[in-house]
């Protein structure tokens, strides 16, 4: 910096100290200017905080945000493509549901239901990723550009204006001791900076409808996300309700204990295989010859209508006819009647 420049900086510092410590009066800016300056300051603080809070809203886990930021920074340093996106909570939940749905398998109700809901959660995570991208492009990035360009430029003009004001006020106090031309030039520079700062603030505040458009983009992105989320959840709800309906229409299976082990003690020199342990099975119902069409009852069936044949679980029923795809006709204990096919298992099929 030149000697003249150092001298000017010293004069500004002297004037600033005299105002703060000595109570000297500086040149006052008009109320309209100060109101614009206040609004610009609020706008600047609002932009910064809203950007931060929006990112926290979209990506609520601070640890995941920090890790993602580090990965993206390292990828940029290495010249690699952008790293992975934010791990959505819906994606993590989907992964767990799909994993355990596969482990449980399809021969139960819970496993397939987990798979369906897990798939819905995966779709929700993809929609959430789209929301993140949409909000960043149409809301966060424009606000960042506003902060980095327009607001930073205004701050530069205001800082320059303050420096020229201090220079003008310092010289004004020494009027008569310095050349009038030097004071006049200081006033012209002050007025010039004031006009530039005033104009830039006015243009920013006058065009604030752009920020309204950006807010609208934020709301529209959220609306689209929630529409798609509702559609996904409604579809999986229908499938789950259908599963519940089908399961409730199926007869409930009863627990059938397996044969218990019995302990047989050897007599004399005889030996028993398996260390003297044997299995005793439950006796099979008798009274039906297994060379004729018959079936075994899987569940109890209580007749509700005339002509139906009631039976207990494990009964062996003689088959006489198949009425249709849902009903058999058979005999048990001298009684004849109809009963549902899905309540029995075939031992000897009816001849075709």
From Swiss-Prot:
Positions of region (Binds and tubulates liposomes): 1-125
SMART domains in the record: BAR (SM00721), SH3 (SM00326)
Pfam families on file: BAR, SH3_2
Region (Disordered): 1-27, 245-289
BAR domain span: 18-249
Comment field (misc): HeLa cells expressing the N-BAR domain of SH3GL2 show tubulation of the plasma membrane. The N-BAR domain binds liposomes and induces formation of tubules from liposomes. The N-terminal amphipathic helix is required for liposome binding. The second amphipathic helix enhances liposome tubulation.
Name of the protein in its database record: Endophilin-A1
Organism lineage string: Eukaryota, Metazoa, Chordata, Craniata, Vertebrata
